[in-house]
């Protein structure tokens, strides 16, 4: 028996009805087949830059910026031997013949997609096993296939893993994962939030609603992991994921379509309020000299409607500008308008608005250290909203027309080349809808 009575209609990213009357629990990260596969594969998938390894060896530039060792150049044909290297690496990575190990060459042998077997994850405390096992296997494989001498083997290690372990990260390495290293987590349970917005945008090939969906899936799955989506708060996150992330009842699509031509943040807020009134989610509680104060008997559902409106406002505003930089202001003033105009709580009960204040300062005020694309839900500025702010940033970066210094192309090229080849990463909305439990 379902725990909750809520049911939603599911639509694709073109506004077409796909499935009717789906219980929200079918979209839970604990139940939905596609979401569970996305999370599992994100933990075990590694991108290997074989072209980068070859270039690093030939130039003797390893270990990050400024690290050049003249006299240690190696003329190694990594790309020409890519098939043999990949085959030998797979033999080392797999636990047994026929398991779910994947080593697939892409882009004419310049890149490799690796999925370490599930059995390695099951025998590990956390996800570092994926990049470390992959790196070790490719280092040994390149040494063997390309007949590297014992005196030059350390250069191969440096070309693959970079400065690690002298550095905490794989500085200057030629492997990449969606998940950042555990040492950079803000606290327990933050791993799935520790993914650059640009990585999400790159993996979904800048499809706005797919980027929103993947971001929302990761954020809310993290809430289940860290204990936020438990008990009284589980329904809040299920509804938030459904409406903001997965276009439930076509609400997000309808709001964008209605406001796309000449709408504003304010007009989106008005439409959200009207839709919520029509659907019986909110109602006028009292009038004060003509000012209507609204209330609701279902805060979780109102929050979901408001969260969908927040992404819609971002798409309308940042889409009009074709620039992501103003996303923090959109998050701030969408909520500000809701609170002052209607007396209703903003998204995430003030946490999204509060996040936007700090986000504005850190992304382009006197601090101004980085653009929206290099933030994530693990960042000290943006971590405070419980899954409802980062999907807006993903939407903004998907719509950006190249205005950012830190663009997905700059920060996430290897992620795009490899992770976008995985169907569930590229089109999560499609697979979550198709693979929801009946």
From Swiss-Prot:
Subcellular compartments: Cytoplasm
Binding site for coenzyme B: 369
GO cellular component: cytoplasm
Gene Ontology terms describing biological process: methanogenesis
Cofactor note: Binds 2 coenzyme F430 non-covalently per MCR complex. Coenzyme F430 is a yellow nickel porphinoid. Methyl-coenzyme-M reductase is activated when the enzyme-bound coenzyme F430 is reduced to the Ni(I) oxidation state.
Cofactor or coenzyme needed: coenzyme F430
GO molecular function annotations of the record: coenzyme-B sulfoethylthiotransferase activity
Pathway connected to this protein: One-carbon metabolism; methyl-coenzyme M reduction; methane from methyl-coenzyme M: step 1/1
Enzyme class (EC, first level): transferase
Enzyme Commission designation: 2.8.4.1
Coiled-coil ranges (or none): none
NCBIfam families with a match to the protein in the record: met_CoM_red_bet (TIGR03257)
Protein name: Methyl-coenzyme M reductase subunit beta
Source organism per UniProt: Methanothermus fervidus
Lineage, broadest ranks: Archaea, Methanobacteriati, Methanobacteriota, Methanomada group, Methanobacteria
């Amino acid at each position: 028996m379902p725990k909750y009575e809520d049911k939603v209609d599911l639509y694709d990213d073109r506004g077409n009805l796909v499935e009717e009357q789906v219980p929200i629990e079918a979209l839970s990260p604990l139940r939905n087949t596609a979401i569970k596969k996305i999370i599992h594969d994100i933990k075990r998938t590694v991108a290997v830059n074989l072209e980068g390894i070859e270039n690093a060896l030939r130039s003797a530039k390893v270990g990050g910026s400024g690290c050049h060792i003249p006299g240690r150049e190696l003329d190694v044909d990594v790309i020409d031997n890519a098939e043999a290297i990949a085959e030998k690496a797979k033999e080392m990575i797999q636990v047994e013949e026929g398991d779910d190990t994947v080593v697939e060459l892409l882009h004419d042998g310049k890149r490799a997609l690796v999925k370490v077997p599930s059995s390695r994850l099951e025998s590990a405390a956390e996800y570092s096993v994926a990049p470390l096992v992959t790196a070790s296997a490719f280092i040994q494989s390149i040494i063997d296939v390309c007949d590297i001498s014992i005196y030059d083997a350390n250069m191969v290690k440096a070309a693959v893993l970079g400065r690690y372990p002298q550095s905490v990260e794989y500085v200057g390495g030629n492997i990449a994962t969606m998940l950042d290293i555990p040492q950079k987590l803000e606290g327990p349970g933050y791993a799935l939030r520790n993914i650059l917005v640009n990585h999400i945008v790159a993996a979904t090939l800048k499809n706005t609603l797919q980027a929103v969906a993947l971001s929302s899936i990761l954020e809310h799955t993290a809430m289940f992991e860290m204990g936020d989506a438990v008990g009284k708060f589980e329904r809040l996150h299920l509804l938030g994921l459904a409406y903001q992330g997965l276009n439930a009842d076509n609400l997000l699509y309808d709001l964008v379509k209605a406001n796309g031509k000449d709408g504003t943040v304010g007009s989106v807020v008005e439409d959200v309020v009207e839709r919520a009134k029509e659907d019986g989610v909110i109602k006028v509680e009292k009038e004060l000299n003509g000012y209507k104060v609204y209330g609701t008997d279902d805060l979780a559902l109102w929050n979901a409607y408001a969260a969908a409106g927040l992404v819609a406002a971002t798409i309308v505003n940042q889409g009009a500008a074709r620039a992501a930089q103003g996303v923090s202001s959109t998050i701030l003033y969408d909520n500000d308008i809701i609170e002052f105009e209607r007396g209703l709580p903003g998204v995430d009960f003030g946490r999204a608005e509060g996040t936007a204040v700090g986000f504005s300062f850190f992304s382009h005020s006197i601090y101004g250290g980085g653009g929206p694309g290099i933030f994530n839900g693990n960042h000290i500025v943006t971590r405070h909203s419980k899954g409802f702010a980062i999907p807006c940033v993903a939407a903004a970066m998907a719509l950006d027309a190249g205005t950012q210094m830190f663009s997905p192309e700059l920060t996430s090229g290897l992620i795009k080349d490899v992770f976008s080849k995985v169907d569930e990463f590229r089109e999560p909305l499609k697979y979550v809808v198709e693979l929801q439990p009946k």
